[in-house]
Curated annotation (Swiss-Prot):
One of its GO terms (cellular component) is cytoplasm. Its EC number is 2.1.1.61, 1.5.-.-. It comes from Pseudomonas putida (strain W619). The keyword Methyltransferase applies. It comes from the Bacteria. The keyword Disulfide bond does not apply. SUPFAM superfamilies: FAD/NAD(P)-binding domain. It is found in: Cytoplasm. This is tRNA 5-methylaminomethyl-2-thiouridine biosynthesis bifunctional protein MnmC. Residues 265-657 are annotated as: FAD-dependent cmnm(5)s(2)U34 oxidoreductase.
Length: 657
């Protein structure tokens, strides 16, 4: 659990040469005329990065770790060198920690100092949104470049990272200016994340830093510096191999053997995201969808809401939501605003005293750039309509047309979508997973991702997953001249969105018992009653009193949720063999048997996103790809484990159920 969810941005002063100075550290971020040259000398040349990039095999990935993202200069220089020298099918994954991220305006101002890096800074700035505490992942160049920012204190963030770092950029302000970072605990983490041959470059030549790095397992040497810096240091990890980070039931499975081909079953948000993340890593992906097109079930609503139901206590679900929200928002920047999505904000009304109390705790726990409390008069000014109360305003929230996001994710040239392919059974033969419909073989591949919501339970390895279907119905309301005033999504027990085209979306009901997806008049009436609770003014503007509920248009679909409300994302084990391998846990839950997990090689699941799929599904695609490829996980290790399919098998053993 993170020590703090309260983000602090960098406090910047600009000198007469245009250089940014940190008020927190009392130091300059880079030399005005030598910054790029210094980065190239200390970090690129001393770690032999040009050679490492050139030696990358097709589909190979080099992982760089950095302390102190700052203005991003080291990242952009590394990206530029990678673009010049690496194989077209190779990848770069850059992981960087930053305690005080620059605001967008300061970041943009710094980047104007490097016009020669514009090809790299401009796409970054376009996605530099929704950067909040914790793990924040970015994707560039059609997935060829991944940036994972760990926002927070380095000694809180690095221990949560599951990664195998090839090169370290040991940056950040000088030890004298930033003593809290330069500690033995930091060097222990660098060593934990390294392997034999991991390279390291750093500006500092301070004696105790050098000695501490050597003690942690690095072989260090001083080398000639650049400009006013006489000497710098470079090194290599030569210490002992590091122990696994986790218990065997959460260990990384070996990568599937054979061709880089995968099946994804289901073309909703989870399936589309899984396909996109694998395709970006060079996999040829076949998506099998039983309907005539993607996003025909729960992902097919005309408008979904980017609403963050957070906890003030830094729970695994809250961390997942915060990381997933940022990732989705950055993906949406590539779509058509107004038609595919809109960052109009989300207003959550404090509709009773209990909700007001909950919102007060959240307003104290999170920074104002994410959410802020607003009184009724300000809430009405934001929304453009009359409201019964104030609440929390999520500035970066909004609505999304989910089919547009699915379609965009499926457009990668490595993906083919096969509609009207309803997979009824999976079989493993000759190292391949075979997808069958009766006696008809639909497709086969060494790897498969089950992404069909609750229908993943039709396949034996996932039959015991405790997934639950909850029916929900939305109502589509024709826009009026008066209702166009609604300027933000407003939520209470339900939600209403500003118009997309000529319709508002209103919803959504919760029915735990019905399996019938035919829209009902009763639920249209229930949705209209929810609208009255949200805003009688808006209901009047929409003329709902004159609308005949039986004439209203809408759609119903099943949400798919798990008992702990976290998605189920990761590799799948053989249930019977798992129970046998770890049977001792039934007697002593503290035992960690040294028994490898009986994985069903190449089988993964991505399901259970409930009503949060827009926020959790896209990042879960990256989590699936990281499990498969051995890349850094896009979430803290504890959060990835909290989403792991094996959590339920463990609970059954420990609780004796």
């Amino acid at each position: 659990m993170p020590a703090s969810t309260l983000l602090q941005h960098a406090q910047i002063d600009w000198d007469d040469q245009g250089r940014p100075h940190s008020r927190q550290y009392g130091d300059v971020y880079f030399a005005i005329n030598e910054g790029i040259a210094e980065t190239q000398h200390v970090f690129l040349e001393q770690t032999r990065l040009r050679q490492r990039f050139a030696n990358l095999a097709p589909h190979g990935c080099l992982v760089i770790g950095e302390t102190g993202f700052g203005t991003g200069m080291n990242f952009f220089c590394a990206w530029q060198l990678f673009a010049e020298t690496a194989h077209a099918d190779a990848r770069l994954h850059f992981v960087s920690v930053e305690k005080y991220p620059l605001g967008h305006a300061d970041m943009a101002r710094a980047m104007r100092l490097w016009p020669e890096l514009a090809a790299f800074t401009e796409p970054f700035l376009r996605q530099y949104v929704a950067v909040h505490q914790g793990f924040q992942q970015f994707t560039f160049d059609q997935g060829r470049i991944t940036l994972t920012l760990l926002i927070g204190d380095v000694l809180e963030q690095l221990p949560q990272l599951d990664a195998r770092i090839d090169v370290w950029f040991l940056d950040g302000f000088a030890p004298a200016k930033n003593p809290d970072m330069w500690t033995p605990e930091l060097f222990t983490q660098l060593a934990r994340l390294s392997h034999a041959g991991t390279a390291l470059g750093t500006f500092t030549t301070t004696g105790w830093v050098r000695r501490s790095l050597i003690e942690a397992g690095f072989t260090m040497k001083k080398v000639p510096g650049i400009g006013k810096k006489w000497e710098v240091m470079s090194g290599e990890y030569t210490g002992p191999p590091n122990a696994p980070m986790s218990a065997p039931w959460y260990a990384r499975p070996t990568a599937p053997e054979g061709p880089r081909e995968a099946l994804v079953i289901g073309a909703g948000l989870a399936g589309s995201a899984s396909a996109a993340s694998l395709a970006a890593r060079g996999w040829q992906v076949t998506v099998l969808e039983r309907h005539d097109a993607a996003a025909r079930e729960a992902s097919g609503n005309p408008q979904g809401v980017l609403y963050l139901k957070l906890s003030a206590h830094g729970t695994a679900l809250s961390q997942m939501i915060l990381s997933g929200f940022g990732y989705t928002r950055r993906q949406l920047e590539l779509l058509q605003r107004g038609q595919d999505w809109d960052a109009c904000g989300v207003l959550q009304l404090a509709f009773d005293s209990k909700e007001a109390e909950r919102q007060g705790r959240l307003a104290d726990a999170f920074e104002g750039s994410l959410l802020r409390a607003v009184q009724r008069n300000e809430a009405e000014a934001i929304a453009g309509v009359g409201l019964p109360a104030g609440g929390l305003f999520y500035t970066e929230g909004g609505w999304v047309h989910p089919p547009a996001l699915c379609k965009a994710q499926l457009q990668h040239p490595n993906i083919r979508l096969l509609a009207h392919h309803d997979v009824l059974a999976l079989r493993k033969a000759d190292g391949l997973w075979q997808a069958w419909a009766g006696d008809r073989l639909l497709a086969s591949a060494p790897m498969v991702v089950l992404a069909g919501a609750a229908d993943v339970k039709r396949f034996e390895p996932c039959a015991q997953l405790p997934l639950k279907r909850i029916r929900g119905q939305i109502t589509r309301l024709p826009v009026t001249d008066a209702s166009r005033a609604l300027a933000t999504v407003v939520c209470a027990e339900g939600y209403v969105a500003p118009p997309r085209g000529e319709e508002h979306t209103l919803g959504a009901s919760f029915d735990f018992h019905s399996d019938d997806l035919t829209p009902t008049v009763a639920e249209h009436q229930g949705n209209l009653a929810m609208l009255d609770e949200i805003s009688t003014d808006l209901a009047r503007r929409l003329g709902t009193a004159a609308l005949a509920p039986e004439q209203l248009q809408g759609r119903a679909a099943f949400r798919c949720t798990s008992p702990d409300y976290l998605p189920i994302v990761g590799p799948v084990a053989d249930p019977a063999a798992f129970a046998e391998a770890y049977a001792v846990l039934a007697k002593d839950a503290r035992q960690v048997p040294e028994v490898p997990c009986p994985w069903l090689e190449g089988l993964y699941v991505n399901s259970g996103h409930g009503s949060r799929g827009l926020i959790t599904a896209p990042l879960s695609g990256e989590l699936i790809a990281a499990w498969v490829s051995g890349e850094p996980l896009p979430l803290p290790r504890a959060v990835a484990e909290a989403c792991h399919p094996n959590r339920f098998g463990l609970r059954r053993l420990i609780r004796g159920k």
